[in-house]
Design a protein with these regions (language model features):
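Thiol-/selenol-based redox modules, centered on thioredoxin-like
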Residues: 127, 132-177
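Conserved helix-turn-beta segment immediately C-terminal to the redox Cys motif
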Residues: 45-46, 55, 59-84, 101-105
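Short, internal strand/loop/helix patches
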Residues: 95-144
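Thiol-based oxidoreductase modules, predominantly thioredoxin-like and allied folds used
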Residues: 51, 75-94, 108-119
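N-terminal "domain-start" segment that seeds a small globular fold
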Residues: 4-40, 124
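Amphipathic alpha-helical repeat scaffolds
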Residues: 31, 51-55
Length: 177
């Protein structure tokens, strides 16, 4: 009987933990072109948020991100968020960033205005992505450019991946296959 009670309590805790996940609020954010992101365009899709930079050792990941987007765009939207907080590796303005991404990598996924992903000016989206008290799943800290956060079609955080994780890694693509 004690074993049964112990198992029942374990399942109850797991169930409670699963129900803590909160849906991502629809934060207001502008694209590089200055228009507000319309979240309804992405209903039913996975969202991959990536803090990006043009002068980083991980910048070639734009190519993999574009390939990921082209392969899975029916079920995935990639949102690149330029950030200049790591080594000042994204100093450009909106026009320069857009031009760099298009000319060098053919980027056609969504790019936003430049934001802060940590610190006192942390953008609210990144507060939600990185704080278990906000997302109900886990806490993390953004370590460098090209850290990735995957949100499910239900708008709940699935996981995050450090910069060293290739965009085409099975860790990420297994969710869409």
């Amino acid at each position: 009987m004690k074993l049964f009670d112990s198992l029942a309590n374990t399942f109850k805790k797991v169930e409670q933990g699963m129900s803590r996940a909160t849906e991502m609020p629809l934060f207001e954010i502008q694209t590089l072109q200055g228009s507000k992101i319309e979240w309804s365009k992405f209903d039913g899709k996975y969202l991959l948020f990536v803090n990006v930079a043009s002068a980083c050792g991980f910048t070639p990941q734009y190519k993999g991100l574009q390939k990921l987007y082209e392969t899975y765009q029916e079920q995935l939207e990639i949102i690149g968020l330029p950030c200049n907080q790591f080594g000042a590796q994204e100093p450009g303005n909106a026009e320069e960033i857009a031009s760099f991404c298009e000319l060098n990598f053919g980027v056609s996924f969504t790019l936003t205005e430049k934001i802060s992903v940590k610190g006192v000016n942390q953008y609210p989206l990144y507060k939600w992505l990185t704080d278990v008290n906000e997302n109900g799943i886990k806490s993390s800290s953004v370590k460098w450019n090209f850290q990735k956060y995957l949100v499910g079609p239900d708008r709940k955080l699935i996981d995050y991946y450090y910069s060293t994780t290739d965009p085409l890694s099975k860790k990420i693509t297994r969710h869409f296959e």
